[in-house]
Each structure stands twice: as C-alpha cells, then as structure tokens.
Amino acid sequence: MKLIIATRKSQLALWQSEHVAQILKNTHQIEVLLEGFKTKGDVLLDSPLAKIGGKGLFTKELEESMLRKEAHLAVHSLKDVPSFFPQGLVLAAVSKREQSNDAMLSQNYKDFLSLPKGAKIGTTSLRRKMQLLLLRPDLDIISLRGNVNSRIEKLKNNDFDAIILAMAGIKRLNLDKQVNFVYEFSKDELIPAASQGALGIESINDEKILELLKCLNDENALIETSIEREFIATLEGGCQVPIGINAELLGDEICVRAVLGLPDGSEILKDKRMIKKNDFKGFGESLAKEFIAKGAKELLKKAESMI
C-alpha cells in the first residue's frame, strides 16, 4: 500500500511530515510519499495573521486535496487546526508532544529582562503580544510574518532586538545554533497557544487508513490537547484572537493555565488550576464557561475590534 501525505512546503512543515512518514514506513513497511501545497497563510505574508482572519489559514488547501482524493492524510501543527473538520475528514491522531512553551531568540540580549526599554520584538501572535506587554509594557511589539529562516535573517540584520518563536519549532529545526541567545519562557510568564508543540494528523475517514495511523497516537498528548481544544471550541476562538491555554500532565495531576484579553494587555482574564488526571474530560469546556461568565465573549469581541 502507498500513503500520500499532503504538506505545506515550509521547512518546519516538511520536517513534521517527513517525521510522520518515517514512523509510518518503519512501523508498517509501506511506501509514503509527500505532496506539497501552498496554503492561504503561506501566500498572504504582507498582512498580520489576525487581519487576514478566517479559520483554516494553514489547513484548507491540504483538506481540499484529501477531499479530491489526491492525498490520504495531512500533518499539521495542531495549534493551526480548527476545532471542527469538513465532512469526510477526521483528526486521526495526535502525536507525542514536543516542548509547548515559547522562547525568545536574540543576538544581543541573553534574557527577557535584559531587553532595553523600547526594544523591538517580532511576533506573529496577538496572544504573545498581549502577554509580553503584561510583563513589559515598555516594549515595542511588531508584527513579523514569513518562514522561520526569513525571521531569523531579519533578527540578524538588526531589524529586531528579539523575536518570539515556539520552542518546538526551534528544537525541530535546531534554530538555537543560528542565534547567540535563546531564552525559554516559563508557562507562567507566557501561556502557550492551544496544542502548541503537538502534531495533529488529519485523514480521510477510512477504516484501513485510520488503523495504520493509530501508531502515531500519544495518550498524554491526547489528554492535554483535548482540554485545550475544548476550551477554544467552547469560546469559539480561532488562532487569530489573544487566547492562551495549556494543560500539562504532572504525574496523576494536570496543571491547566488559561488567559485571554485585549492585544495591548489592558484587560485580561487569567486562571491556573490543578485537576486530577481522571477528571480531564469536559474540563476545558467547564473552564471556558467560567471565563464566559466573567465576560470572556465580550472581551474577545472587543479584542477583534482592535485588530
């Protein structure tokens, strides 16, 4: 049997798809091919993600290729995957999670506190912008789009004093070797995006294919990301609004951190809970409902009007 993986053409997307292809080849001794596509999010690089809006910026074209029967599966950064899938497609697996926290890359400053007043910080994310300004209102947060290599190039050209990336991508592409300093944020400093660090394998709804993809599943990643995705789905928040949610398994307990608010950090809702591992089902939804009772929907609407 031959499997075809639909993938974006960015360096990180290709790494992720090759990684999954290798596991499938080794486990099942089958042929696995990659088919590259450009998504809307890859093409529209002049505008901040939040302004482009819409769900599935990095997934829609890959999903369409599967629905046209040109591919059997697609490998996504799970944080880019909307909560609901087109008919005929399913979330087949969530693979073992890489580190889920964010990090600061810089040529001149070894950590976040050493950044000078007014330092220029590059990031695509309103979630990061909101939390960075909470920690350091004196910073200048500037929108930064493009692939990872072009972002690092801009940093080296001194367009920015620092840029913020997900630690998972830094590790997968060995980006720490390309810059002088990498400062890892704790999850209390910067709450990550839902499902950050996890790969989501989306596939056609076919029994044989789903059986082959079972080997990619990781139970811990499934538990953590199900809480996070449930929280986002209940709030109806896409990746363009400032929401952070992270569930971290610690033995038989789970630490859940959540934050949302306005991009400038002037108004936020934030919480941190410890729950029993066995109580994870439905917790994301119930936490989101508590946030809604405190005015989360109104706050997110206000955030959208500021974008």
Curated annotation (Swiss-Prot):
It catalyses: 4 porphobilinogen + H2O = hydroxymethylbilane + 4 NH4(+). InterPro entries: HemC, Porphobilin_deaminase_cofac_BS, Porphobilin_deaminase_N, Porphobilinogen_deaminase_C, Porphobilinogen_deaminase_C_sf. Signal peptide: none annotated. The modification S-(dipyrrolylmethanemethyl)cysteine is found at residue 239. GO terms for molecular function: hydroxymethylbilane synthase activity. One of its GO terms (cellular component) is cytoplasm. GO terms for biological process: protoporphyrinogen IX biosynthetic process. It comes from the Bacteria. Monomer. The porphobilinogen subunits are added to the dipyrromethane group. This is Porphobilinogen deaminase. It comes from Campylobacter jejuni subsp. jejuni serotype O:23/36 (strain 81-176). The lineage of its organism: Bacteria, Pseudomonadati, Campylobacterota, Epsilonproteobacteria, Campylobacterales. The gene is hemC.
